[in-house]
Amino acid sequence: MKHGFARTMGFLMAAVLLLAMVLPAQAATTGKSGLFSYTLKGNGTASITGFDWSQYRDNENIFIPQMIDGYTVTEIGPSAFARGKGTLDTRFQDKTYFAKVIIPETVRKVDEKAFFNSGIGYFTIPASVKTIGTAAFCTGTLRSTTVDNNNENYASIDGSLYSKKDKELLALAVETTSIPNGIISIGEYSCINGLIELTKVKFPSSIEIIKNYAFNGIDSYGDGTIRFDHVKSVGDYAFASLRESGVTIYFGSTLSEIGRNAFSGARLKALHLEQCTKVTQIPWAAFADFSASEKTRLPSSITEIGGMAFANTLIHEFAFDHMKPITIGSRAFEETGGVLDVDDNFFSRVESIGEYAFRGACFTLNRNVHDIKDVITLPSSCTFIGKGAFDSKWTAFKVQPGSYAEEWAQENGYEYDNGTKAKADTSWLN
């Protein structure tokens, strides 16, 4: 037993000594030199992970070192130079938009959001850079990028940054007045630039994809028209939170997919979607808190209206001509702040209506009044109606005898008509 105890204690002491040797090595994997913070990678090279903006002199050029504390710099890490949160933040513009960042030839990778919202105006990118992450150079005030002509993967045209392989716009610069024909994708966050009036930028007919957050939160649209006649998909939050503008946006018949919150909070002059007959779904909050000066007509192909799709929207600015949705999500039209202009067949194919879907909404059913109860016909295909789906102040129902809708109306105390008349009691005549 004594020998076993001694052997165990020996193992424990060896483990403690080993930890004592390892811990200092681990602590040395991060460091700081001047304004730069860095982390050592497994191959013994360094990744820049942070920058001390509190010690930065306004509009001074930033030279990223080739070597830092004796280690070769091969990477600029995620959000290493990023500032603030969210989308465009004008607090940083006047301090950095004349500054230039020179990336050394040792760097092979610039990670996602590396310079996001930093306000930096100019970049020099060497041929050595093989990988650029999402929104890496979306600074909010990008003036120009210069990419070495020998770079195999990336290019700069009129100051804007592009991926050669993906034929994608990665960052739009203020010098750019047109995107070259052949570009098929507008990258995430790529057009967020507070120095640009986007209506003065010509987008080619070759564009097929608008990725997430591509135009999110822009307040420099100006007045004019932007056409995306051949776009097939619009990503999540792609046009969300656009500020007050006089812009009109057109989409053509090729559009088949609209992302979540795609136009939520946007303020436009007009949005044209009437030709988009391949679109079958309005996803979550796609038009929540949306506003346009002219009425937006949606295609008749829509079969699914997602949750919060039009919540808190001035709904009279939309036309639902001949639309026959099958599924209406929870809170889809909640507190729409106007009269919902639908035709008499709007509910003719509906199968499911989510909770609070029409709370606070009222209908015209092709009548220009809403001070009387509108009679909504619920078909026998309807097998689910969520809690508080309708505001009883404005609605009464026509239902099929023995249907789910009739049972629901009875249980919830709604006024309804099932098309039958009660048989008169004649027993007293006997």
Model-derived segments and spans:
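Consensus positions within tandem repeat domains that build extended binding/scaffold surfaces
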Residues: 78-80, 112-114, 134-136, 188-189, ...
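Non-globular, low-complexity intrinsically disordered regions
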Residues: 49-50
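Bacterial N-terminal signal peptides that target proteins for export
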Residues: 1-12
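Sec-dependent signal peptide cleavage junction
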Residues: 19-32
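Bacterial N-terminal signal peptides
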Residues: 11-20
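C-terminal cell-surface addressing/anchoring modules of secreted/extracellular proteins
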Residues: 427-430
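Structural signature of tandem-repeat unit edges
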Residues: 35, 39-45, 57-74, 86-109, ...
